[in-house]
Amino acid sequence: PQYLKESRAIPLPLKKINAKNWLEVTQHYRRLFTLEIQFRRFYVDYFLKVLGEQKKFYAECECYRQGQRTGIADNAMKIGGRWCFVEVKLNIHTEPHLHNQLKKYCQVEKTALDKERSAEQEKLWQNSVLVIDTTDFYFYDALTDNLIFLKNLDEVCTEEDIKTLREKIIPLLQ
């Protein structure tokens, strides 16, 4: 097709991304990630280390309700004194069943944070999931089944902006 003939590849400078420059480098290239794993590794992982109360966060967290696995959340991070699940997408507008997926991470009895560590119900936010895509950051409220826009990532230019976002999120958690 003609549009392919006229297109040009733009190399992503992934090798240049590190803990000191990730936000500056990815700000320009963030929307060009074509794989969720790229977006996670080169943006979200750094983002969560700043957003959370501790740098440690967990990936691929199995959620359980009544002894049955309900789903696997992309991440769990500590915020507001408890673990909160984070779902990562390239574009939430291409996810027709996103709300159903997010509900699987709510009202859970426990989560396997990794192979050795788990968190019980009282250490988990029960009705809240954070959602990030290459454009925006959202808060999912399971009680109202609403996905609430919090921030356009173009407005997140410094780590201080992320810390300010944390303070906006904490009162919403339930």
Where do the language-model regions lie?
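A short, conserved, highly charged catalytic patch centered on acidic carboxylates
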Residues: P1-S128, D136-L173
